[in-house]
Amino acid sequence: MKLFSCLMALLLFLLQAVPGLGLPRDTSRCVGYHGYCIRSKVCPKPFAAFGTCSWRQKTCCVDTTSDFHTCQDKGGHCVSPKIRCLEEQLGLCPLKRWTCCKEI
């Protein structure tokens, strides 16, 4: 699994180095969260759906057995940047710049 992550990071770096060959933004975000883009609308276990990839044509699936957890898995709530958290919490939110809050 570590080798695959390293290879994906290298591929992402090379794609960004060549003008015009960058990944779509949603795909880059998925890979940044150690996710995988699949064609199915449902992720296989132990993966959880976490947004989209390839211009919303594929589903981003994040491994739930890793250290990366969605905000709701940890009992938090994703809030927009306009809302201040009383207590922030670690966790991934599907929308860019949103924050995972334990208490709002």
From Swiss-Prot:
Signal sequence residues: 1-22
Keywords: Antibiotic, Antimicrobial, Defensin, Disulfide bond, Secreted, Signal
GO biological process: defense response to Gram-negative bacterium; defense response to Gram-positive bacterium; innate immune response in mucosa
Compartment(s): Secreted; Cytoplasmic granule
Keyword Disulfide bond: yes
Tissue specificity annotation: Detected in outer membrane of the vitelline layer of the egg (at protein level). Expressed in the liver, gall bladder, kidney, testis, ovary and male and female reproductive tracts. Expressed in the ovarian stroma, but not in the ovarian follicles. No expression is detected in bone marrow.
Disulfide bonds: C30-C60, C37-C53, C43-C61
Matching CDD domains: BDD1_Gal11, BDD2_Gal11
Record's keyword annotation contains Secreted: yes
Assigned GO CC terms: extracellular space
Molecular function terms from GO: CCR6 chemokine receptor binding
PANTHER family: BETA-DEFENSIN 1 (PTHR21388:SF9), BETA-DEFENSIN-RELATED (PTHR21388)
Physiological role: Has bactericidal activity.
Family: Belongs to the beta-defensin family.
Protein name: Gallinacin-11
Source species: Gallus gallus (Chicken)
Encoding gene (name): GAL11
